[in-house]
Amino acid sequence: RFKKIRRLGALPGFTSKRPRSGSDLKNQLRSGKKSQYRIRLEEKQKLRFHYGLTERQLLKYVHIAGKAKGSTGQILLQLLEMRLDNILFRLGMASTIPGARQLVNHRHILVNDRIVDIPSYRCKPRDIITTKNKQRSKALIQNYIASSPHHEELPNHLTIDPFQYKGLVNQIIDNKWIGLKIN
């Protein structure tokens, strides 16, 4: 995990740790001129590790984005940002995307009052994301929300009610709110 962060830079969804500033300078001095292949590979790896995708899943999303009208890169990022695990992370209900995946896999999350246990579930506008009415589920989410430092900077396509453990997807994400810097 730390090797990946040192190599690719800060990945907020992957872990809350940040690379030290001195290691960035060493990497740049050591690496020399980057080839086009290396730049594209690093950007692809950033996407994979940040969103927790396998190679096959990423290829599937690229294929869907290629068929849609508009910029393939922007549509790809919109598809990835509208995944359930990522929306839980953005709402502050989980500290990292892998943590959000675990919440979904362990059936703590309801979408429109139905249990969803698939982290890659594609959320749509007007979806209501809540926790189960069990005490354990509410305690887990409450701990994450209380310890969440980025609660103020909630993207404008999401709203959260921390007292009812409820989040709402208002619209498809706007490009300026995508948290990952991709070249």
UniProtKB/Swiss-Prot annotation:
Gene Ontology molecular-function annotations: rRNA binding; structural constituent of ribosome
Record Pfam families: Ribosomal_S4 (PF00163), S4 (PF01479)
Domain S4 RNA-binding: 82-143
GO cellular component: chloroplast; small ribosomal subunit
Location relative to the cell: Plastid, Chloroplast
Gene3D superfamilies in UniProt: Ribosomal Protein S4 Delta 41, Chain A, domain 1 (1.10.1050.10), RNA-binding S4 domain (3.10.290.10)
Keyword match RNA-binding: yes
Keywords from the named record: Chloroplast, Plastid, Ribonucleoprotein, Ribosomal protein, RNA-binding, rRNA-binding
Cysteines joined through disulfide linkages: none
GO biological process, any: translation
Transport as UniProt keyword: no
Subunit structure: Part of the 30S ribosomal subunit. Contacts protein S5. The interaction surface between S4 and S5 is involved in control of translational fidelity.
HAMAP family named in the record: Ribosomal_uS4_B (MF_01306_B)
Role noted for this protein: One of the primary rRNA binding proteins, it binds directly to 16S rRNA where it nucleates assembly of the body of the 30S subunit.
Protein family: Belongs to the universal ribosomal protein uS4 family.
Listed name of the protein: Small ribosomal subunit protein uS4c
Native species: Aristea capitata
Gene symbol of the encoding locus: rps4
